[in-house]
Amino acid sequence: MKKSILFIGLISFIFCSCTIIRPGQVGVKQRLGKLVGTPKSQGVMFVFPFTTTIVKVPTRTVNKEVKLNLPSKEGLNVASEISILYHVKEEKALDIINAVGRNYEQVLILSTFRSASADVCARFYAKDMHSGKRAVIEDEIKKQMSMLLKDRGFVIESVLLKSIK
């Protein structure tokens, strides 16, 4: 009886000691509050559950939709819905979590996007946001965001103006 209880306890401890990193994620060990080691891509990671956790960072493409009122060259506010497609570079995941924390999307991506989109849209007329210059506006926002975020470990794949009102 004691052996079976000990065996069940050992098996449950082993299962609590492993974490699965799925495809499109990297895992970084956090031991006693400090990030240690290098990011590990998909697979099983074994940890000591009382002192270590795994911080998972998605490296697949993320689609972030944002609704904003953007200024135009005439001084009008144009309501818009815009999508940002981006991903995190696997080798920079540790640096991102160390520098910014788990809330990196709100802190870096969205604040940079709001600034870049307001700067770019203020150079165009409101009618240009509905016409053929839409692609130019998207490309300018993407270039400005990429310039600011590429050294921090983010790849901006695309910026899409979905609806303009």
Go through each PLM region and give its residues.
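N-terminal hydrophobic targeting signals that begin at the initiator methionine
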Residues: 1-2
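Sec/Tat signal peptide C-region and signal peptidase I cleavage site
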Residues: 15-17
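Hydrophobic membrane-anchoring helix/hairpin
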Residues: 19-121
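Amphipathic, coiled-coil-like alpha-helical scaffolding segments used for oligomerization/assembly
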Residues: 85, 105-165
